[in-house]
Amino acid sequence: MTPSRHENGLEFDEVSGSVTAVLESAPLRPFADPVMSFLGALSTAIMKDRDSRRMPDLVSFGYWCRRANLERMAGRYVFDAPVVGRGLAFHVPPTNVPLNFAYSLVCGLLSGNGNILRMSSVDAIEVRKAIALIDSVLAREEHKAVRDMVCIVRYGHDDRVSAYFSGLANVRIIWGGDATVLHMRSLPTGPRTVDVAFADRTSLALINAAHVSKSSEDELRADAERFYVDGYTFSQNACSSPRMVVWAGDERSVADAKARFWPAVDAVALKRGEIEPIHSMNRLVELCQTLVATNVVTDVHGIQSASARVSISDVTRWQEIASLRFGTFTEATVRNPRDIERLLDQKVQTLGVMGFGSDVLSRIAESAARGGVDRVVPVGAALN
């Protein structure tokens, strides 16, 4: 880590790369081959690293940025004319999802931009490992072009430094919730600077109870695996991680579905062995704090299992306790899937769905669109 002082007296640490090099770099076209080659090499390095295998979030990132996946992603974009990145992207990642900075960086690189990322002071082991692997791959001579497009900086809560980078940026990628977004927007930027902001959002899943009740053991296990990916990756910190599970069906079918589904999810969690004791403790602490601070919780089930379920007195108030994490899910029931609309608003990012036919899915999508939801995806694809 190299302490730096600019001529205007601003101080920050260059954790990786050089600010000067990034400022002097030229933008590339989207999905440029040097970037694709670097990310493919990074994916390989992560997947082969022995320490990384004990860090499921890092392994997930490495798998996501493998070249074959990025090639599929590139195939979704068709450009009618030659295009290049906007220039410099200044990233302000969140603190609650440690490896989010890596995903943000990949997006900046794939869009052809030079990137300066502000890292938080949170010293997570997977962040240190990720940066070390990024550095090791960038150090290879064949990746010099990409090396000059990446700089990771760290500094305290200093608006002067944030304003400095904001003034240089052509794009700002701002994570961290409403307060962070509003604060960053109060800082001066160039007249053509574009902000990509991720404000406070939450997500939920809608599950067809009859589908779960009638599924085979293999189908149930596969559904539980898909739900686990959405609900437990990043310790339920991602905006697209479901915080609420809404069951569609009559009282009996919902009861039968719950009795099958949650033990299957617990079995997946036990098999994967990724839930640490500290996660269980944090879940209990957060739940107790919620019970003290609100009057909406009426019952809690499965607190000693991998999946704690919370019942509330008024399901329309579910977002009041949407900060619960580490495998804690508010539950609600609707008889008709379209009734989900009363639980949706513009703070809902993702609605995951499971077990519905195409006709019902179309009606659900219409309800979600009216509610202001960004997207409707199959359970298991919420983090894509």
Residue positions per predicted region:
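Short His-Asn-centered micro-motif
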Residues: 92-95, 119-120, 153-155, 174-177, ...
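NAD(P)-dependent aldehyde/semialdehyde dehydrogenase
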Residues: 234-352, 360-371, 376-384
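Short, surface-exposed basic-aromatic patches at helix termini and helix-loop junctions that form
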Residues: 107-110, 136, 186-191, 368-369
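N-terminal Rossmann-like NAD(P)+-binding subdomain of aldehyde/semialdehyde dehydrogenases
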Residues: 1-87, 377
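Conserved NAD(P)+-binding/catalytic subdomain of aldehyde/semialdehyde dehydrogenases
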Residues: 143-251
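Short, surface-exposed connector motifs at secondary-structure boundaries
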Residues: 113-116, 145, 164-171, 344-350
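Conserved small-residue-rich beta-alpha loop and adjacent elements
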Residues: 74-138
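Donor nucleotide-activated moiety binding/catalytic core segment of transferases
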Residues: 75-90, 96, 153-163, 310-323
